[in-house]
Amino acid sequence: MTKEVITGSEALMRALRDEGVKTIFGYPGGAIMPVFDALYGYTGGENKTFNHILVRHEQAAAHAAEGFARVSGRVGVCLVTSGPGATNTLTGVADAMMDSTPIVVIAGQVGIGALGSDAFQEVDLVGVAQPICKWAYQIRRPEDIAWAVSRAFYIAKSGRPGPVVLDLPKNTQTDTCEWQPAKTTNVRSYDPYPTLDTQAIEAAAQLINGAKRPFALVGQGVELGNAHEELLAFLEKADIPAGRTLLGLSALASHHPLNMGMLGMHGSYATNMKTQECDVLIAIGMRFSDRVTGTPETYAKQAKVIHLDIDASEFDKNIKTDVAVLGDCKQSLPAITALLQPAEHKEWIASFKDYAEQERLRVIEKDIHPTDGPLLMGEVTHVVSEATRGEAVLVNDVGQNQMISSRYFTFKQKRSIVTSGGFGTMGFGLPAAIGACFGVPHRTVCCFMGDGGIQMSIQEFGTIMEQQVPVKMILLNNTFLGNVRQWQDLMFGHRHSFTDMLNPNYADIARGYGIPYDVVTDRKDLKMKVEKMLSTPGPYLLECAIKPDEDIVPMTLPGKSVDEMLLELHY
C-alpha cells in the first residue's frame, strides 16, 4: 500500500498529536512559518487538535511550558522561530534543566543550505543548548521528524526529567516525506530506570531500623515519580519526621503530623536545627543544593546518610553518602519499606516541636498576625492560603515573595508548588502561572510576585487578556528588590546600590489590559479584598502595599552551618 506523502510541517503536527499534546505555547516568525501554517489547520473546526497560546515573549513560552508540566505531569511544549526567538527560550531551558522539568522546545532554523553563512536570524542552537538540556538535535530530513519528536518526548519525561531542544531547518518543514509514525521505547546508552540494587536496599533498611533519631528530606523526586503514597507508607511505618525542600513542598501535605516544615536558607527552624541532631538522614529525590546544606563541611556530620535518587550523578556530589540507592523512588521506597520494622519515635518527634514553638513565637506570629504598621508579606500569604483552604496551586516569582509565600502557603494536594528553585529566574512567576492554568484548568492558581519580578514579564498581561487566563495575581509591592536589599543591609553596610524601585501605576496597566484590579493599603481590608479576588471570574491583580524594609527570617547566612540559623537579624 502506498504511504501518504506529506510535508515536514504536517509530519510535526501528526507527531505531536501522537504524543498526546493538546497545548502549545508559542510565537511565530520567519523560520517557523511553514509549521505555523500547518498548525492553523489543527487549531479550529472539526480537526481541532491543539490549543495554541500566543505569548508575548519567547522566554514566557518556555516558562509557561514549565508551569504546565509541573502541575500536570505531562510534557510542556513551546514553538518558536530561529535566532532571537530560539535564544529567548534558553533561560527557560536552563531553568527546566536545573529543576528537572520536562519540556520540549521546537525552534525554526534557516534552511540547511544557508547554515554557517550568518544568514538572517541564524544561530547554532544545538551548540548553544547542549550544555543546558538533556538532548539537543537538528532535524535535517522530514522523514526523521516523527522519530525525533518521539525520542524527544521519551527523553524529556523519562528518568530524571528535563528539557529537550529540537532545531528544525526551514526546508525540513517544507520538503515532503512518506508518513510513518514512530514510538520510542528505549535509547541506546540511556538507562532512565536502573534496576534496584538489593544490597543497597537492605543496607538502607538496616540503618533505618537501627536509628534512634531518623530524619527524612523529601524532594521533588517524589512528585516527579508520583510516589506520594509510597512516601506516606515509608514515613508512617517507621515513624520518621520529614522536612520538605522548596520544590518538594507539596510532596507531603502541610498538615501531616510527620511534616516538620520546609528545608533551606529561609526554611523552618526545626528542620534546619534537627538536621544536625539526627543519627540517620534519608534524602529522597533531592540533590543537597547549597540552599539546603549551608556549609557542606559541617552538614549532618554526625549522621549516616542514605540518598535515594534516580540520577547517580547526585550521589556524593555535595554531601558524602553512606548508602546510595539508585532508582525511581516509586520502586525504591516500597522496597525499603517492606524491610522496615514498625517503630515509634515520639520523643524525637516531640523535640522538633520545641524548635517550632520558638519559631512560632519569635517569627511566625509577628509575620502573619501583626497588629500595626504596614502590611507584611506573611500576613498576605496567610490570608490567601486560608481563603483557598490549601487547595490552590501556588506559583511564585523569585526573591522575598518566593520565600515568604512558600513558607506560609498550605498544601493539601500534590503538584501544587511551581517555583524557580535552582536557577532563581526572576520573571518566571507570571508565565509559569499562565501555563499552570492550562495544565490544571479545574484548580485555582495563585501567583505571588514582587514589583521586580512582575516587571520582567508584565507583557504577558497581553496573553492573560487574550486568553482570559483565570490567574489570581498577588503583587507584593515593597518598592525594592527586597532580597538583594536585605543582603545589602546584612553585608554591605546598608548601601542600597540600585535596589530601590520606581514603580508604574499598576492600576492603569491592569485597566489597559482589561484585567480587574484592586489595591490593599490597610490590613483591615485585606481579607475582604482577597475574597473578592478569588470570587471574581477570570484574571485578577491584587496589589498589596508592603513594608519596604521587611526582612525574611529565619535565615542561614552564607558560609554558616544550618544550625546557626537566625530567628532575628541584627544590623
Feature-to-residue mapping (PLM):
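Phosphate/pyrophosphate-binding active-site segments
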Residues: 1-3, 143, 206, 302-398, ...
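N-terminal alpha/beta PP-like core and its mobile active-site loop of ThDP/TPP-dependent enzymes
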Residues: 2-347, 383, 387-390, 470-473, ...
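Active-site diphosphate/adenylate-binding microenvironment
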Residues: 9-13, 17, 35-39, 356-436
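Thiamine diphosphate
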Residues: 106, 114-121, 316-318, 324-326, ...
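Generic enzyme active-site microenvironment
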Residues: 165, 307, 395, 448-449
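Short, internal active-site loops enriched in acidic
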Residues: 170-173, 401, 548
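Conserved short loop/turn motifs at secondary-structure junctions
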Residues: 219-224, 369, 450-452
